[in-house]
Amino acid sequence: MTDKEQVVIYTDGACKGNPGRGGWGALLLYKGAERELWGGEPDTTNNRMELMAAIQALAALKRSCPIRLVTDSEYVMRGITEWLPNWKKRGWKTASKQPVKNADLWQALDEQVARHQVEWQWVRGHTGDPGNERADQLANRGVAELPR
């Protein structure tokens, strides 16, 4: 499938302190059009912001569609492609019977993914990928715009 036929989404999270003030950002591209999304939370973690970026980007789409979602988060990538099916089978417990961290957001992401046909792609962060760099800027904007 070409990028002209699917929505391409770049997501990123940022945190000043972990936990600390955090932001998430997403860049959505479709047929030459762009949409930027960002937000933040005063007390959060980087992993939660990475998840929020993906959740908010997918939730922003009004109807089911094919998507290529690009993330630099190994946590999100491995969680959605490797760990999630087993967490669900175990009632949101890890292999060591511990509650899954950020289960609320993993469940929200799972709900959003079910609405679409998502192809996941991992990229190394901060290596000059234009979409990833834009998502990073948006995530940092999410932090910067939090009230002090």
From Swiss-Prot:
Subcellular location: Cytoplasm
Positions that bind Mg(2+) 2: D12, D136
Coiled coil: none
Cofactor note: Binds 1 Mg(2+) ion per subunit. May bind a second metal ion at a regulatory site, or after substrate binding.
Signal peptide stretch: none
CDD domains: RNase_HI_prokaryote_like
Cofactor(s) this protein requires: Mg(2+)
EC number: 3.1.26.4
One Pfam match: RNase_H
Record-level Gene Ontology MF annotations: magnesium ion binding; nucleic acid binding; RNA-DNA hybrid ribonuclease activity
GO terms for biological process, alphabetical: DNA replication, removal of RNA primer
Reaction equations catalysed: Endonucleolytic cleavage to 5'-phosphomonoester
RNase H type-1 domain boundaries: 3-144
UniProt entry keywords in alphabetical sequence: Cytoplasm, Endonuclease, Hydrolase, Magnesium, Metal-binding, Nuclease
Residue ranges, annotated region (Disordered): 125-148
Chain's role: Endonuclease that specifically degrades the RNA of RNA-DNA hybrids.
Subunit structure: Monomer.
HAMAP family membership: RNase_H
Family designation: Belongs to the RNase H family.
Protein's UniProt name: Ribonuclease H
Organism listed in the record: Pseudomonas paraeruginosa (strain DSM 24068 / PA7)
The encoding gene: rnhA
